[in-house]
Design a protein with these regions (language model features):
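Glycine-rich loop(s) and the adjacent beta-strand/alpha-helix scaffold that form part
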Residues: 2-59
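Residues that flank catalytic or metal-binding motifs in active/ligand-binding sites
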Residues: 27, 35-36, 127-129, 201-202
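Active-site beta-strand/loop architecture of penicillin-binding DD-peptidases
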Residues: 135-142
């Protein structure tokens, strides 16, 4: 049994192959990001209080609750690849101070500045809703060894069809609550518009 995680196990197998171990020619192929996306509903009509307060709490009187308590499932009996799941989430307290800065490049300047002054537990960030979604990508990622490091190649990963379907579904959910749909702020700044995943699979 090789249990070093998706990336670690693939790296061990690729290194072993280069040292003469007979392995399948599929090792390193068909990596999937699980069609994951993180997104936000900004400025909704209702107060959400989904930003963690830490312990001891930074602010009294807010009950944040668990990270995921609700889920929407979109089924498609004709095409399973089009199925997707959306969960609501909470932002950890450690991330709270950086939230306004994350949203500055995303056209939310006024609200971000307001929360920089008054904190994320008041103003527009009090109605910020976090969404985690999973779907089906084409599993087109390929791993290889680049010198001494594992490298991933996936042409046009950001243009996978599943992300457009997720955008459409999430936008509908967010707008029905009176908010504005905001994609993962870090994807466009820190990550160069590449997708992120919490569930690396295959390879």
């Amino acid at each position: 049994v090789l249990a070093a995680g998706t990336l670690g196990s693939t790296e061990i197998l690729l290194r072993s192959r280069d040292q003469g171990l007979a392995v399948s020619d599929r090792v390193g192929k068909r990596f999937s990001a699980n069609g994951d996306i993180i997104a936000f509903g900004y400025g909704a009509k209702s107060i959400v209080n989904s930003v963690g307060v830490g312990y001891p709490p930074r602010i009294e009187g807010l009950e944040i609750g668990a990270s995921v308590t609700g889920q929407l499932e979109f089924r498609d009996a004709q095409n399973l690849d089009h199925e997707l799941t959306i969960q609501e989430g909470a932002v950890p307290s450690a991330v709270a101070p950086s939230l306004p800065v994350m949203f500055l490049p995303n056209g939310r300047l006024l609200g971000a500045l307001q929360s920089l002054v008054s904190g994320v537990y008041k103003g527009p960030f009090a109605s910020l809703q976090t969404y985690f979604a999973v779907s089906h990508d084409t599993a087109s990622g390929t791993f290889r060894l680049d010198g001494d490091k594992l490298a991933l190649a996936w042409k046009d990963a950001q243009n996978e069809p599943c992300y457009a379907r997720l955008d459409e579904a999430l936008r509908s959910v967010v707008e029905s609550a009176g908010g504005d749909y905001v994609k993962n702020p870090l994807a466009g700044t820190v990550m160069g518009h590449q997708p992120a995943t919490a569930h690396p699979l295959g390879g």
